[in-house]
């Protein structure tokens, strides 16, 4: 009887600790694994699955005095730290001319070709491939704006198409000459309804093909990706993929942004990507994702999440952040062999200084372009950057803390292969 009672008491304790969902769910909520982080193994994951990050702001951050550290608390090249954490791919955005006539940068990393080459060389030196993300704009290109570069503003369409082809080819030639291991090229960024100032899909398709041609002629082994967003909108991706097919656009990868607080369910993401892959024989991936680990603002510039009205399906904790990344990887893997990878957006865009030092932060953002936009960008983007220029809106979604130390969630990239064991 005593033995039976003892077993009953232990059972009550276990259920009280983990609830009826079991230790896996409890660990997923609290991170009770040996590593301090619980990551469930991703089923069906390809051995060559892309575990990527976009660290486009890194040069500007380092120029602003930001340092990064390894697990032991010693300063270390962030690219080495990323590689050690299981990252195998780096994405970098490329703007044609993100400067005003006096050479003042628009911010957001001031990501021109020179910056891309610096980042690409460091990625290659640490054994990671590069995804070159051409925006074909002088600043941010997204569904709300796809402004042509200043130098192309007065070109007719045929000349613009030629300029896009030549710019792509010359840029890739320079990157290859620098010894960069380019694995993929993105022809446009979140091009839901525009590209380089064009909004007609017949013309957009010709521009896509001009960029694709430049890639094919540079290196036939480089994958060509097209990038879209808002997978939660019913029928959007089916319509885009059919339109690309109808206009005979040459590409390999249909890429999607997926931010959990904006873009619907993971089930839907898998469904719409599977439909594109199965119908048109394309590879698919997530080119951008991220998640919050804290609600704190690190630099005095407001963050994009969390906010009222957003759907946050995981806790705003380091463990919740790891859950979110792991689940996006699973969603893409669930597509099957066509699901090739996931990129985390700006995991190192941490504060250049604490929030209470806002005025000093502003000076660094303006000088080095280490915030999302400078006041100089107003001439090119008056309605957005001109009004809301400032610092990092995603410092609370980084995979490093505000002082540059790696969070446990950074290791989700290596843990998805095996999972993490529980603490004893």
From Swiss-Prot:
What are its E.C. numbers?
3.2.1.-, 3.2.1.89
Q: Which domain of life is it from?
A: Bacteria
Residues annotated as the enzyme's active site: 190, 288
Task: Tell me the lineage of the source organism.
Answer: Bacteria, Bacillati, Bacillota, Bacilli, Bacillales
One Pfam family hit: Glyco_hydro_53
Query: Protein name, please?
Result: Endo-beta-1,4-galactanase
Species this protein is from: Bacillus licheniformis (strain ATCC 14580 / DSM 13 / JCM 2505 / CCUG 7422 / NBRC 12200 / NCIMB 9375 / NCTC 10341 / NRRL NRS-1264 / Gibson 46)
Binding positions for Ca(2+) per the UniProt entry: 297, 299, 301, 303, 392, 395
Q: Which GO terms describe its biological process?
A: pectin catabolic process
Keywords on record? Calcium, Glycosidase, Hydrolase, Metal-binding, Signal
Task: Write out the residues that bind substrate.
Answer: 142-145, 229-230, 263, 292, 307, 384
GO MF, one example: arabinogalactan endo-1,4-beta-galactosidase activity
Note whether Metal-binding occurs among the keywords. yes
Stretch forming the signal peptide = 1-26
Its encoding gene is what? ganB
Broad class of enzyme this protein falls into: hydrolase
């Amino acid at each position: 009887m005593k033995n039976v009672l003892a077993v009953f008491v232990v059972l009550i304790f276990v259920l009280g600790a983990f609830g009826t969902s079991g230790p896996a769910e409890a660990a997923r909520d609290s991170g009770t694994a040996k590593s301090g982080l619980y990551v469930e193994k991703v089923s069906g994951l390809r051995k060559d699955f892309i575990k990527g990050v976009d660290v486009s702001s890194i040069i500007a951050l380092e120029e602003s005095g930001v340092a990064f550290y390894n697990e032991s608390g010693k300063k270390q090249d962030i690219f080495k730290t990323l590689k050690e954490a299981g990252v195998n791919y780096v994405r970098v955005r490329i703007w044609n001319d993100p400067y005003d006539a006096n050479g003042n940068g628009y911010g957001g990393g001031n990501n021109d070709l020179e910056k891309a080459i610096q980042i690409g060389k460091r990625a290659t030196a640490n054994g990671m491939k590069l995804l070159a993300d051409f925006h074909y704009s002088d600043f941010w290109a997204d569904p709300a704006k796809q402004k042509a570069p200043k130098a192309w503003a007065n070109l007719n369409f045929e000349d613009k198409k030629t300029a896009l082809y030549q710019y792509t080819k010359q840029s890739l030639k320079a990157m290859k000459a620098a010894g960069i291991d380019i694995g993929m090229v993105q022809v446009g960024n979140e091009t839901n309804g525009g590209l380089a100032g064009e909004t007609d899909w017949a013309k957009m398709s010709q521009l896509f093909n001009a960029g694709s041609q430049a890639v094919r002629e540079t290196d036939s082994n480089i994958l060509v990706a097209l990038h879209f967003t808002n997978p939660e909108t019913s029928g959007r991706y089916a319509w885009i993929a059919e339109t690309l097919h109808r206009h005979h656009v040459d590409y390999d990868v249909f890429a999607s942004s997926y931010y959990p607080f904006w873009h619907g369910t993971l089930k839907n993401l898998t469904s719409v990507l599977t439909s594109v892959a199965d119908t048109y024989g394309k590879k698919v991936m997530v080119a951008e994702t991220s998640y919050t680990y804290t609600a704190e603002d690190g630099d005095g510039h407001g963050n994009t999440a969390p906010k009222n009205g957003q759907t946050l399906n995981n806790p705003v904790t380091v463990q919740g952040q790891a859950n979110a990344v792991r689940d996006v990887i699973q969603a893409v893997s669930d597509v099957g062999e066509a699901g090739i990878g996931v990129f985390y957006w700006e995991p190192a865009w941490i504060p250049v200084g604490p929030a209470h030092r806002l005025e000093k932060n502003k000076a660094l953002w303006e000088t080095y372009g280490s915030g999302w936009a400078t006041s100089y960008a107003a001439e090119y983007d008056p309605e957005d950057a001109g009004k809301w220029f400032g610092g990092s809106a995603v410092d609370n979604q980084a995979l490093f803390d505000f002082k540059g130390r790696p969070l446990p969630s950074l290791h989700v990239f290596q843990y998805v292969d095996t999972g993490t064991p529980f603490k004893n």
